[in-house]
A protein has these predicted regions:
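Conserved alpha/beta-hydrolase
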Residues: 96, 103-125
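Alpha/beta-hydrolase active-site loop
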Residues: 127-150
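Conserved alpha/beta-hydrolase fold motif
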Residues: 150-152, 174
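Hydrolase active-site cap/lid region
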Residues: 169-200
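Gly/Ala-rich beta-loop-alpha elbow adjacent to hydrolase catalytic centers
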Residues: 152-161
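An N-terminal hydrophobic leader/cap segment in hydrolases
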Residues: 10-66
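Active-site glycine-rich loops that stabilize anionic/oxyanionic intermediates
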Residues: 83, 91-94
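Short beta-strand-to-loop junctions in surface cap/lid or active-site-entrance loops
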Residues: 74-84
């Protein structure tokens, strides 16, 4: 059976020193290498914010809060209005300001907006995180800051929002943008492959 060659886009290529260190660890101990890779896997990357998103920060009220469910500090953004209440949840390696066009349109039409930078993302305090933690955070926000008439979410944030609703969080509407249906094991195997290591 022919082995399929996987090409990695330039912006996903990892620094040589990181891949080299992972390979040395893998040679010494598979267990150590796995723990090292898992730690990196759960660590969001903070990308540079483009200038087009600057207006989002000018228009929102910002508050760093202590999220009890995850014991971490996270950044909340709000545009108070008298209309229906919407919560925005971004995807992995994302940030709230990526919703700037949708948020501007909705707030101009009277919607009350709340957006969250997930743990380790955007302007929240740098930290590792994972799906169960983000699910707990969305549930906490719906209880402590809600109720919300709708939750708008992207990719990984959609998976967390679906899980939180499944576990009792309430909202009238759930809007999923490019929802990911993730199984962690295949995702982690692909991630390990980026280091040039045996995915098994």
């Amino acid at each position: 059976m022919e082995q399929r060659k996987v090409s990695v886009a330039a912006h996903y290529k990892l620094p040589w020193f990181l891949t080299s260190f992972a390979r040395v660890l893998d040679f010494v101990s598979k267990g150590l290498a796995t723990r090292f890779l898992w730690r990196i896997f759960c660590g969001p990357i903070k990308f540079k914010v483009p200038s087009r998103e600057a207006e989002f920060y000018n228009k929102t009220e910002q508050e760093m809060i202590d999220a009890e469910s995850v014991s971490k500090k996270i950044m909340l953004y709000q545009i108070p209005n008298d209309g229906r209440r919407i919560l925005f949840v971004h995807g992995w390696n994302g940030r709230s300001s990526q919703f700037y066009r949708i948020i501007e349109l909705l707030s101009d039409n009277g919607f009350d907006i709340t957006a969250v930078d997930l743990p380790g993302h955007g302007r929240s305090i740098r930290s590792n995180t994972n799906l169960p933690e983000i699910t707990d955070l969305v549930s906490e926000l719906t209880k402590s800051r809600g109720p919300y008439d709708g939750i708008v979410c992207h990719s990984f944030g959609g998976v967390a929002a679906l899980n939180s609703v499944r576990h009792g969080a309430s909202c009238e509407k759930l809007v999923l943008i490019s929802p990911g249906v993730y199984e962690i094991k295949p995702m982690f195997k692909t991630f390990v492959g980026l280091f040039g290591l045996d995915e098994e």
